[in-house]
Regions:
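Charged, amphipathic alpha-helical segments and their flanking helix caps
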Residues: 1-23, 38-125
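A short, hydrophobic beta-strand-centered structural micro-motif
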Residues: 28-38
Length: 125
């Protein structure tokens, strides 16, 4: 795994989506993005690879504010869909939403909603 390029991609997605941090959510009202997996889709004779990287985007909030959490994550998804990421070392990046926000954790005070984002791109070597 090339942690450097994945960190750069996560930072660009964080910037484009207005996400608070890279990692996990730790406080109400916070959003976060974290690496969730990758795969090589195709290899070419010149050493170029078409890759797919998946990130999980999460938001945490009070139980009575679930609608706001979903709207926040949908807004981040729209920002990704309307953007053109600029990432050094990759070309022709495209971003798509793999899953809409769903509740992934709940206790008596808070919910965490998560959606999945996939970025496909070409990379030399």
């Amino acid at each position: 795994m090339n942690g450097g390029i994945y960190t750069i991609i996560a930072e660009e997605l964080r910037r484009l989506g207005g996400i608070d941090r890279i990692g996990v959510v730790t406080a109400p009202g916070e959003t976060a993005i974290i690496y969730a997996g990758d795969k090589v889709l195709k290899k070419y004779f010149d050493g170029t690879k078409k890759k797919s990287v998946i990130f999980s985007v999460s938001a945490m909030g009070e139980v009575e504010r679930q609608k706001e959490l979903v709207e926040k994550l949908c807004g981040i998804g729209e920002a990704f869909a309307d953007s053109e990421p600029v990432i050094q070392g990759v070309f022709q990046p495209t971003v798509k939403i793999n899953s809409l926000p769903v509740p992934t954790m709940k206790n008596e005070h808070y919910y965490i909603y998560t959606s999945s984002v996939e970025i496909n791109f070409y990379m030399k070597g």
